[in-house]
């Protein structure tokens, strides 16, 4: 690929447009949180392919596990978000898995949730689901989902992550870009 370089001036100009903090809205307004500034938010882990059950067995996650994790996140006052992919529900086919994951986050918790970044289409589905829950007009003007993207290696971003980032950015939703 081609290495893209951004000038320091442009980078600093773009960074200056980022608000020092923003409101991440929850389905339940009482669970809405402020992100940034001196605020700390705690969320469940994200993206685990395995779970460890009460018998100490390591196994693939299931939809039941995911639902239970979202219910736990909802009940724990120390957590400010239900995340989304607390574990992968491996019995659900990949093309539809994201729908079940977001449905679980929105059904079993009224806290803020995180988006899916595994394809442009899946990110678009997340935004459609957010529009159903919050109303398209509200989503247009407010932050309702935050997503985390990561590079494959230093200096390499794949098309999947970039496409998902574009979807969320086009809806004015924040993205955590992890190195």
Summary of predicted features, one role per range:
Residues 2-53:
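Glycine-rich, N-terminal phosphate-binding loop and its surrounding beta-alpha-beta segment
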């Amino acid at each position: 690929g081609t290495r893209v370089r951004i000038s320091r001036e442009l980078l600093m100009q773009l960074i200056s447009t980022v608000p020092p903090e923003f409101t991440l809205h929850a389905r339940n307004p009482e669970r809405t949180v402020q992100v940034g500034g001196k605020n700390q938010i705690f969320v469940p882990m994200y993206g685990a392919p395995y779970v460890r059950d009460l018998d100490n067995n390591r196994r693939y996650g299931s939809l039941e596990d995911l639902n239970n994790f979202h219910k736990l996140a909802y009940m724990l006052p120390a957590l400010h978000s239900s995340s989304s992919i607390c574990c992968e529900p491996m019995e659900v086919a990949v093309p539809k898995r994201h729908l079940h994951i977001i449905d679980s986050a929105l059904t079993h918790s009224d806290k803020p949730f995180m988006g899916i970044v595994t394809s442009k289409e899946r990110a678009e589905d997340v935004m459609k689901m957010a529009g159903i829950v919050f109303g398209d007009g509200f989503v247009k003007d407010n932050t309702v989902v935050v997503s985390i993207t990561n590079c494959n290696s230093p200096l390499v971003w794949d098309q999947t992550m970039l496409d998902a980032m574009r979807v969320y950015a086009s809806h004015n939703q924040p993205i955590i870009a992890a190195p």
